């Protein structure tokens, strides 16, 4: 039941009326209309009264109020029924449909648009781009179909002149993924003629009023509506629709949907062709038919992308094949006009069907695999023409009203008849409620061999000239005694009916008088093959594809096509079967008055609609019946988690007993009845409470399942990880063993090799052993080095260590380190180097040893020295393990300067073959010298000096910084300067010269 509104608005649900009577029903309907409450429930059926004004009840805030809510939680609204259909589809994976019914002008088309907008608004919360694209196209398709399929009538400014059923496809998440549109019986006769006060289809007026001057010029059109015969009748009529604005809306919608520019242009050309066809005038010159305004033919040919003479021939002649002979039969003026009008109607119908097909191609569900994406469910929305009674009712009204009879029959079957029969079949106590079953009227129209459609088809198939009067006579003879059929012949006193013209059908919605004139022609729907060939031979591929049957040979014999009435009957039967397979939801639309006024509520007019829609009977069945029924098995499958007696499985004798236990556990036993195979629930509130309990339990069930499943996944992951680690461990062990074995094999016996295995190539280690390999190679290299060292005499070891130190510090930075010769170290005491003065130096060295108590002599050599005053002198350096002495060899090696080794911070040498060396001191009084030897001359001693000093410092666990650079940076008494080295030819010995930045050491060249 609906949420209770204030009493000033009446009853929100007709089921809540104190007494079920027509006066009370009408009083409540009037009160709610006058208070602006246009929607009222009958249980789960929405009764909608057309307000004839814009109401602010469809915005985003209203959508949020109804989203996910149950019917009884909010006041009556279209959104409530749309949400109910959506929830049923999503919860139970069941196809649903929303059937909107009512007579023309009752608001069906607007209702369908609001339902579509609501479904679009509540879906795709994650804003997936593809879903948004589909939703946008589904919504945009409405305005395109309205432009080409709707028209202004005396009862409705936007009347649907075709039937539309749209299936919206949803994925398992409940998001729209596509759709499909079925269209039924376009009223194409409106293209060429309209009743007074009515217009043709909106598309013509939109093109003329909204098209640009350039576009209209290219189509040979002008904005004046009265210039075109086919639409002149409605040219001066006022409409609530802004044609110019709607033209742009429709054009934009076609682009959004996916129509190509050339397709849109072809659509405009077809509309222009129809308007030009209406202006063609035929005259007869003797026996020859002619077109009075021949220029129009050229325009039509240009727009159809064909030749003017072909267009003219198709309009004036008809090609007839008799055996092998082909004859061009001239038309009379009347036949030419008939052919032109038939051509115009056919072109428009093909255009409309092509638009629907094109939209379907674009919005159809693509690449959807149910095994991957889950079940594809559907919500169908039926917006079809309402019941029509005009001053002049023809073939179109006959088909439309037959359609409404079929839909009313479906409503009776599902809501009134089947429901009561099901109660009796299930053994539920029930008092039968009488209702009018319109099956007799449906049979009157569609029954095989006896119905009106069968009689009409028989008349159309007769050989010779068959008139509408002959068809009416056949109706009189075969249906004259039928209770719902009458004519002037069967009711001679009824002067409303014209002789040989009218017949009356007593429909469920009231009596309708039909004029038989035009029935035969409209049922045959004749279009000469010449026009089909003309269109097929167009150079415009869009037009060509619209007329595939035009490719047939002139002499080819084709099967007689089904008549328009039979095609419509078959489509209605298929539609009803489709709707019957879905769970239905109803919107019953009521037209409050015929003046389109928002203030007038015509009691008599509304009462008549309430009666023929069977709304009062609907209330009675709803009050006495049950809102929901389900088989015990399915009910238990959905709600068994609510009770501990049924979860996860019950041990009771039957599913029925288990359902009883569950219902009693929840305390709903007074609101249900138990049938033979189904449970019946009276009020929606009980069902919604069950859904709430289920939703609460589902959280716990899902959490439990998640816990179990996550635990299972964790255990599986742990086992897989453990197994993988075991495999990795054993594999690594295997690789390590293999590597060790291979190393052992390759290096077996290296102790007996001359190079102790230097040439042996190491095997590639596993990634995990790369650091181990480095350590192993280091150990091997140490061992090999130790083996090599064992062969060196103990007296040579200091020299070897010094050479190693020199290599570490200078290798790759200086060309000649003097490694190939023996290092003497104390060259001043060597007779070959200083034959005259060596005897003088030795006593000085001994005295210094006594005085300074040094242990070892590290290095001594003659040098050339430069001081801060740029004075160059021959000197000698004497390096012990404690001091560096600068001596004057000309004064019997007198000590000129003593530098403690702890005051020495580093050495700088050049990267050439020269013997430049700078001793850096802590007090920034660097010593700049160039080593030189007398025998042999130019011997390189830099490597030896660096090696012995670095080795000595290392033995004392101190670091000596050695720089290799050119020029060399130094400091003389705190002043920064540089010493660069240059090679000069004809230079007898190294010499220093002054420059701007410091000094230049010139050394002899080759």
Swiss-Prot record:
Residues 572-594 are annotated as: Actin-binding. GO terms for molecular function: actin filament binding; ATP binding; calmodulin binding; microfilament motor activity; protein domain specific binding. The modification Phosphoserine is found at residue 200. One of its GO terms (cellular component) is cell cortex. Residues 699-719, 721-741 form the IQ domain. InterPro entries: IQ_motif_EF-hand-BS (IPR000048), Kinesin_motor_dom_sf (IPR036961), Myosin_head_motor_dom-like (IPR001609), Myosin_TH1 (IPR010926), MYSc_Myo1 (IPR036072), P-loop_NTPase (IPR027417). It comes from the Eukaryota. One of its GO terms (biological process) is protein transport. The keyword Protein transport applies. The modification N-acetylalanine is found at residue 2. It is found in: Cytoplasm; Perikaryon; Cell projection, Dendrite; Early endosome. ATP binds at residues 102-109. Keywords: Acetylation, Actin-binding, ATP-binding, Calmodulin-binding, Cell membrane, Cell projection, Cytoplasm, Endosome, Membrane, Motor protein, Myosin, Nucleotide-binding, Phosphoprotein, Protein transport, Repeat, Transport. Unconventional myosin that functions as actin-based motor protein with ATPase activity. Plays a role in endosomal protein trafficking, and especially in the transfer of cargo proteins from early to recycling endosomes. Required for normal planar cell polarity in ciliated tracheal cells, for normal rotational polarity of cilia, and for coordinated, unidirectional ciliary movement in the trachea. Required for normal, polarized cilia organization in brain ependymal epithelial cells. Interacts (via the two IQ motifs) with calmodulin. Binds an additional calmodulin chain via a third, C-terminal region. Interacts with F-actin. This is Unconventional myosin-Id. It comes from Mus musculus (Mouse). The lineage of its organism: Eukaryota, Metazoa, Chordata, Craniata, Vertebrata.
